[in-house]
From Swiss-Prot:
Belongs to the UPF0102 family. This is UPF0102 protein JJD26997_0163. NCBIfam families: PRK12497.2-4. InterPro entries: Restrct_endonuc-II-like (IPR011335), tRNA_endonuc-like_dom_sf (IPR011856), UPF0102_YraN-like (IPR003509). It comes from Campylobacter jejuni subsp. doylei (strain ATCC BAA-1458 / RM4099 / 269.97). GO terms for molecular function: nucleic acid binding.
Length: 112
């Protein structure tokens, strides 16, 4: 990943965090890493953990096309690891935030 892509990713995550806070979410963790992958944002709302993938672009393709079954499987393994590491077992869901040209689309409880 180049420097520009890295900085764009941080900018996208910052925008997503501001959006989530306005929606009443508590941000618990950013960029949680495991040997299986990474979760961009872990947040909580109404006692439900939200594991949120952020996709950010300024190009002319659909951002949601960059999330496939393989990536979702990595996210699920990372969620399992997060639960084990923190000794918790709570309700959770996987969400997707797509940011394209400063427009935020929030897709809740995604699956394949």
């Amino acid at each position: 990943m180049g420097v520009k892509a890295y900085l764009d990713g941080i900018l996208g995550e910052d925008k997503a965090c501001k959006f989530l806070k306005k929606q009443g979410f508590e941000i618990l963790k950013r960029n949680f890493h495991s040997k299986f992958g990474e979760i961009d944002i872990i947040a909580k709302k109404d006692e439900i953990l939200h594991f949120i993938e952020i996709k950010f672009t300024q190009n002319n393709y659909e951002v949601s096309e960059r999330l496939d079954r393989k990536k979702l499987e990595k996210i699920l393994k990372t969620i399992e690891f997060y639960h084990l590491k923190n000794g918790i077992s709570s309700d959770f869901q996987i969400d997707l935030i797509c940011i394209k040209n400063d427009v935020i689309q929030f897709c809740e409880n995604i699956s394949f």
